[in-house]
Amino acid sequence: MSDWSIGLARQVWSVQHWSGGYFDISDEGRVVARPDRDPARAPLDLAGIAAEARHQGLGLPVLVRFLDILHDRVDSLCQAFRQAMVEDGYRGGYRAVYPIKVNQQRRVVEEIIRHGNGRVGLEAGSKPELMAVLALTPPGGTVVCNGYKDREYVRLALRGRQLGLQVHLVIEKASELELVLEEAAALGVTPSLGMRVRLATIGAGKWQNTGGEKSKFGLTAAQALAVVDRLRAAGCLDWLRLLHFHLGSQIPNIRDIRRGMREAARYYAELRALGAPVETVDVGGGLGVDYEGSRSRSFCSMNYTVAEYAHNVVHALWQVCEDEGLPHPDIITESGRAMTAHHAVLITDVIDGDRVPGGADLLAPADAAPRVLHELWTVWTGLDRRHPLEAYHDAAHGLAEAQELYAHGVLNLTDRARAERIWQAVCHALLQRLDPRRRPHRELLDELNEKLADKLFCNFSLFQSMPDVWAIDQIFPVLPLQRLDEPPASRAVLQDLTCDSDGCIRGYVDRDGVESTLPLPPWRPGEPYLLGIFLVGAYQEILGDMHNLFGDTHSVNVRLTGEGYALSGAAHGDTITDVLRYVDFDAEVLRGIYRERVVAAAGLDATARAQCLADLEAGLRGYTYLDT
């Protein structure tokens, strides 16, 4: 591949499509970040950031948060709706509301609110989230209260009204209304109520049941009418100010958004006709992120832009208002994934590898060797004269026969190992002879790429840092941070540190699609090999679990400055003491046990006892990941 170039590297890893312009490959073959997408500003080298974080005591793995990407995501979303409203002559306003469940890290929420400067509100879906939101929302700011509610939740939301916040208390279950009426009367507070309706429209995708008729939340048409009637009977219909619905999360197809908005717009018109003074429509989530860069209807992609999304939301409401002579409502979106996914990158390193050997140094079987070895050797030596598919099938048959003979005690371990070596050599040779442009070759090419892929063992826990990969086969872009000026001469499957076969990434961005192996410059034992796992800023931190007691990773924030960038907010990940405490192991009790056992250990002198105890103490203080 002597014609390899940085342009080809961008194509192979599809960087320009999934990165949103925030990440690129430099002429030196290194991954760089452009947090504000300003081409005039020098890009930030990710490997350099990892080195600086290590200098500050944060080894790998480390989660890097680019705060300026959060700013740019907020600006892009608000600008898209502003432009869509100008184009349609829309007379309502727009506010982005951030659902903190997507990423509750305080610095993330604070950055979004601070940079939003009145353009962004917050959404809470539980009492703990509400307590955080009531503290972080600036005076006069917007708060949307979703989720299941008890009396205390309702009371806290009404207290938010007393604190001067624009709190919208959304009725998601009909039973919640009576609690609201009682608590509002008890506190003497006039609430701003929202009503979440359950649309028939479903946005296809991995989370499609978060919207539509099967949704966990929301009122049916009959329940919505009953809520209106109850409010009217109580003389409180003027409390109903907001219509809320949710099409789904990560909707890949713009047509689903268009259809859902038409249905939702009718709800707005009907509620106004019933006398409810609804003045805000909260369209919920759904705005996607193109994780795989294919710009398609694939569940991990999206076939539209933020601007197209904004246009379809605005135009649907504009159309029904013009047709019915209604005031244009203010619009709220809850696009938390689109706000936060891009800003976080997990940087880790390869700690070991397992490579399938090729045909170098392969020796012919001895004359007395079992027949199956000679048959496999005949396939190997005759590859140039045979059709690749025929040779593969014969070699596969020979390997299966050798494995069966071994199981019956006919072949010994050495014979089996030789059979596997010849098989591997055949597969490597066939891989070079297959042409991906020929349809009959493609299936075998994919199979061989998977069989011959290197296994690279990486210093992270998939269950802690990328739980959606295990849970829903989510795709996250992965690529080396260096050496991308070299051709990807190998393919690999990435394994994590856990003692679990599911701790493996099985889908990788590759050009305009997803493959089961990742193209890489060859890993060389003993050399640092850094990998970046991108777009992990939404949901992954809070959903991560402690399988094998691997805890939170180190994290650090990156902020642009006039001179380049600065690291801030360095947070050390969990120590072994931390994770043991989560499962009810007291470090002091453990220390006491260690001391007793060191004293009782035979054959240790005083110096050895002291060193043994020091090592055990250091182990409790250590990072849960490997020291590299």
Curated annotation (Swiss-Prot):
The keyword Lyase applies. Pathway: Amine and polyamine biosynthesis; agmatine biosynthesis; agmatine from L-arginine: step 1/1. It catalyses: L-arginine + H(+) = agmatine + CO2. Keywords: Decarboxylase, Lyase, Magnesium, Metal-binding, Polyamine biosynthesis, Pyridoxal phosphate, Spermidine biosynthesis. The modification N6-(pyridoxal phosphate)lysine is found at K101. The keyword Zinc does not apply. One of its GO terms (biological process) is arginine catabolic process. It comes from the Bacteria. It holds the Pfam family Arg_decarbox_C. GO terms for molecular function: arginine decarboxylase activity; metal ion binding. Its EC number is 4.1.1.19. It is an enzyme of class 4 (lyase). Its cofactor is Mg(2+); pyridoxal 5'-phosphate. Substrate binds at V281, D282, V283, G284, G285, G286, L287, G288, V289, D290, Y291. NCBIfam families: PRK05354.1 (NF003763), speA (TIGR01273). PANTHER family: ARGININE DECARBOXYLASE (PTHR43295), BIOSYNTHETIC ARGININE DECARBOXYLASE (PTHR43295:SF9). Belongs to the Orn/Lys/Arg decarboxylase class-II family. SpeA subfamily. Catalyzes the biosynthesis of agmatine from arginine. This is Biosynthetic arginine decarboxylase.
